[in-house]
Amino acid sequence: MIGGGNSACDVAVETSRVSKKTSISWRRGYRVIPKFIFGKPSDIVSAQMHFLPRKLRYFLSEMTIKILNGSNKLYGLEKPKTKFGETHPTVNDELLYKIRHGKVHPKGDIERYDGNTVTFKDGSTEEFDVIISCTGYILSHPFFEKQFIDYSESKVPLYLKMFHEKYEHLFFIGMCQPLGCVWPLSELQAKLAARAITGEWVRPKNIAELCQKEVSRPHVKQIKTPRHTITVDYHLFLKQLRRLLPKDYVSKEAKV
């Protein structure tokens, strides 16, 4: 298994249930967050701390992970070199358990591979029956000409990550990567788009300025990679969208 995100770790755990040996290759360190903290979903715990300043919230989150998991080195995994929040954490309850029980074997970055034979950067070589790459997604819109829209290698100049500054009837729904769940945000974006289509919501006149403001002032400062161009703070983005919708048009949050 190549990758350290949610999909890679989930697939590594699942394949380890039926395979004789499963290895997972990370090219950098990731923070692994449990799905449940203190008996509650980790995103709910994060939401309950949202009234705190971001730096303090990140510090407490980092300390909580260290207390619950210990250091990555204890599991043979690379330690994260970035600050908390600069990259997306991985949410998984079983990976560290499987590593400790010898079901998943951590490996470093890959130097090269020839067929099913993989040579790692530490000089070790292993042969695998199946190699699965979960190395992320490219932001792509193949149905558009590249000179029209191509956000694969650049920042995304869209107001609320959905409105183009020139084309009023073009909407991007769900093209954001929150530090939290994407579905409630996508729902609100869809509702806002519906109101724009029916004329119940009017685009701001300074939308070009607002698009550039989102690019220059992102919610979260992260490392400069194509993956991190659409990151939003879940709670802040939720508030921004809700302000533009009638109160009776917004779904109520479930109580946990």
Residue ranges and their predicted role:
Residues 39-45, 49:
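Short, hinge-like loop/turn segments at secondary-structure boundaries
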Residues 212-220:
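Long alpha-helical segments found as membrane-embedded helices
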Residues 1-36, 50-54, 58-203, 208, ...:
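Flavin (primarily FAD) cofactor-binding/catalytic cores of flavoenzymes
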